Amino acid sequence: MKNESQLKSSKRGVLLRLARFMALMISAFIIPSSALADFGYTEDSTNYTIDTGANLVFKVKRSNGDISSLIYNGTDYNGYTNKNSHVETGLGQSDVTISQPSSSVIMVKVVYGTLEQYYVARKGENNIYMFTYIADDSVTVTRYIVRLKPSLFPVLNTSNSWYSSYSTLEAKDIFTDTSTGYTYSKHYSDTRVMDYNYTGISNGNVGAYIVRSNHEKASGGPFYRSLIRDNTDVAVNLYEILYYGMAQTDVKRYGLQGPYVLAFTDGGEPSSKLYAGNLKTDWIDSLGIHGWVGSSGRGRVAGVGIKNMKSDYEYVVGFSNDEAQYWTKASDSNGYFSCTNMLPGTYTMTIYKNELAVYTTDVTVTAGGTKILNSITITDDPSDNDVTWRIGDWDGTPLEFKNGSLMTKMHPADSRLESWKGNYIVGTSDASSFPCYIFKDVNNGLIVYFRLNSEQAAKNHTLKIGITGSYIGGRIQPSVNSWTSKLPSASNQPGTRLMTIGTYRGNNYTYSFTVPASAFNTNTRDWNQLKLNVISGSNGSDYLSPAVSIDCIELE
């Protein structure tokens, strides 16, 4: 029989072996820092904190639905100068709730009046899926802004990046470096909606991006240019545009926009699987998001082909009504096109040659259906007309004219631009020598010199002036030699700034004037002078004076 000391010794041995075993077991379950964290959420009186189970942890304020923290790999990238990421400039007191619809999804819902904002996290992803439901105009909603700490990202060498030391040039949102005369603005993204899938910024080790939605409830169509990103030494902003009023020609649409995705990476680009045209959305169907329509409730339009397309031009097919908008590119070879995931309804379908509408019709989309269109022949391309002479191309843009390709990147006062003066000699000059814009206070009265043979000079001619937009009622009143046209009416255009905010696109419009034979010189060696004068009933100065953007000028 063991004595007491032997029993104590045996007991100590058992305890020691048990302690070693427990230590071994604990060490086996210690999660290394590189492994995934726990997916889930916590809450306190101020925030909901969501851990995505990857490298992203974010917080949403319970008072107003702001994103108050964006922690990626242990560093918080959200906000600056007490400003968070949010709808518009931030909502007031809101009803903010959190739920976990499934083991792999966490959703925060923000209700502010008739507006609803959703933040959705999926297990194991460094992404936040966002949705915005707009019921009416009772809440001002133009954009979602992701605000990032400027100290964590570089000031990029782009036209929408600048330093706070630069001088204000126009309206507190356009700036100039007085040492170079270069201009910068949040407006100068140089990018149409149809030409980008995401926007963002990277410091080489971390990238933060907004992958845009399909913009079906936004406005402006495929060629709309608006805010995408701006970054300075004091602020970094990424935007998803919901309805922006600057240079807007379209109706405001209501309903659900999204998902748009805030994606964090290790410095590289976001996954193409997140792009609006690629994203798989069946997992969203069961979340109960207001206004969500899954793929089974959507339809498709396909066109067999398009005839009378011109080489060297891109053709885009757009669809729009008061409820939604879509677009797709047509095949360069035969004009085949297909537009998918469309909400049911009747749409105006427009075929654009570059950005000029050359064909329109109505088409009806049904849920789960495909509308097949037979081959379409373009009949409304003005370049098909016989002309005496033509300056530029009928394509809905001023890009071929002097300074035209730079107007989406800088202000018209930028020192890098060529002179806004420049007359034109038919048969000698190139379109690139003729200014893309005519400002009443800057370069009014441009002259086009042309000769006519005796047969041409003996008859009336039609002068056509196509514009892509105008500012404060600007329109051209032409004169030929001693003849002057009647006062033309102003075209329907946006009521905001246009030519100075990185876009030339308003409403394409063509003015047509009958020039009598008596206006022309009878001596065929004499030059006729077409003078282009911008007129308006409104006043402005310099580059904010009445103005027009030129698409094409021709004499038939």
Question: Where do the protein language model's features map onto the residues?
Answer:
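A contiguous, surface-exposed recognition patch within enzymatic or periplasmic domains that forms
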Residues: 149-255
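Extended, loop-rich substrate-binding clefts of extracytoplasmic carbohydrate-active enzymes
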Residues: 80-131, 143-145
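Beta-strand-rich ligand-recognition modules
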Residues: 334, 443, 449-458, 466-556
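Structured interaction patches on ligand/partner-binding surfaces of diverse proteins
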Residues: 355-381
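Short, ordered, surface-exposed loop/turn motifs in non-cytosolic proteins
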Residues: 299-301, 307-325
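A short, amphipathic beta-strand motif
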Residues: 297-309, 335-337, 376
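Short, acidic Ser/Thr/Gly-rich low-complexity loop/linker segments typical of extracellular
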Residues: 321-336
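A short, solvent-exposed beta-strand micro-motif common in secreted/extracellular proteins
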Residues: 335, 345-355
